[in-house]
Amino acid sequence: MTGLVMMTKGGGCGGGGKGGRRKSTAEEEEEEEQNQQQLSLVEFLLTALRKSVVSCRVDNRQDDGGVGGGISSAVHHMEIGWPTNVRHITHVTFDRFHGFLGLPHELQVEIPCRVPSASVSVFGVSAESMQCSYDEKGNSVPTILLLMQERLYSQQGLKAEGIFRINPENSQEEHVRDQLNRGIVPENIDVHCLAGLIKAWFRELPSGVLDGLSPEEVLNCNTEDESVELIKQLKPTESALLNWAVDLMADVVEEEESNKMNARNIAMVFAPNMTQMTDPLTALMHAVQVMNLLKTLITKTLAEREENATGSEGYSPSHSSNSQTDSDSDNAQDMEVSCESQATDSECGEEEEVEEVEQHQEHLSRHSTHEDETDIGSLCSIEKCFLNQLNNNAARVSNTSISEDWSPKAFPLVSFTENKSNTLSSSTSD
């Protein structure tokens, strides 16, 4: 068999020329597509760059023509402005008892449960660190005191004989202490235990209620007005605690017929709990003056209550007319008696003056002797009360026996009383 073969100048077969041209055309198309893609990408980048430059350009053709105007225009076109308009709206703090302080009204959150104290115990801590409430007189005192007072009144504790004087059992007191530390006042508690814990709360304060007053100031306080001016020197917390305690003692005195506790007795048992001194003898002497101060304040409170009760009574016209008639008849009788006695007064005037002088001297001597005997009795009573408290504190710490350093033998009880008695006898003999 024979066939025809065509040869070209470029070499190769003539039948493959058409396929070569197709291949070169496809490559050209691919290159054009790549070039177009690159151009489109470059155009996109240029467009984005142009927009960013236009948004941040500075217009130097403004009226002011300054640099400040250009900067303000650039800042105006920026999406995020400079923090130039800043205001301090509120300052919020957190307190354990009151929650968040300083929050707006719509964001305030009430804490449902409040602990009675910031510490583990409600005894031996300052009143500032405890949750406080207001009593009927407006005194801000720890809530635990108000709870104990309410329970004492509800159980008729003020009518118990020897209230605040009879010491409770230590085992029962420790159990009630644990309950009070959790803000719970047990039911059916012994009123003497409750009264003893009220005294213990004042006694175990970091600083006494009356420690802000010097012993010299308390010693020089003799009248009711001086006592009122003296307690004004106390801080608000101590002043509120003292007013609350005085009102409590006044309530006790009002039930004197049942509890056998007068103003002097209740002041005597509270006095050693109001001050704290390192020297026991100095504390004992200072307690006597504190007792007199408390007694004066109690008497003043009772007098004010009596005046308020008397002033609240209604006005009765019939009673006033009867009293006026009685007073007129009494005045007439007095006039008759005075007229009859004018003749005899001139004769025995000198004798009566002599008798009055003698009676006055005798009364002064008896009064001074009675005051000295009263001072001795109050001093002895406070000594016993003070020593009993020291013994109770030592027994609570050791739980076994009373320490020898705090025993009654460490204090010259007999010698001090004997010196006072000798002074009394010498003054009487003179």
Swiss-Prot record:
Consequence of changing residue 91 to A: Reduces binding affinity with ARAC3/ROP7 10-fold
Residues flagged as site, Arginine finger: 165
Residues passing through the membrane, by range: none
Residue ranges of the region described as Disordered: 1-36, 307-372
One GO BP annotation of this record: signal transduction
Compositionally biased intervals (Gly residues): 9-18
Basic and acidic residues: compositionally biased ranges: 357-371
One of the record's GO molecular function terms: GTPase activator activity
CRIB domain boundaries: 80-93
Phenotypic consequence of residue 88 to A: Reduces binding affinity with ARAC3/ROP7 10-fold
Pfam family, one: PBD
Residue ranges with Acidic residues bias: 347-356
Domain spans labelled Rho-GAP: 125-310
Family annotation (CDD domains): CRIB, RhoGAP
Biased composition (Low complexity): 316-326
Keywords from the named record: GTPase activation
InterPro entries to which the protein is assigned, alphabetical: CRIB_dom, CRIB_dom_sf, Rho_GTPase_activation_prot, RhoGAP_dom, RopGAP1-5
Function according to Swiss-Prot or TrEMBL: Acts as a GTPase activator for the Rac-type GTPase by converting it to an inactive GDP-bound state.
Complex formation: Homodimerizes via its Rho-GAP domain and forms a tetrameric complex (2:2) with ARAC1/ROP3, ARAC2/ROP7, ARAC4/ROP2, ARAC5/ROP4, ARAC7/ROP9 or ARAC11/ROP1.
Name of this chain's protein: Rho GTPase-activating protein 2
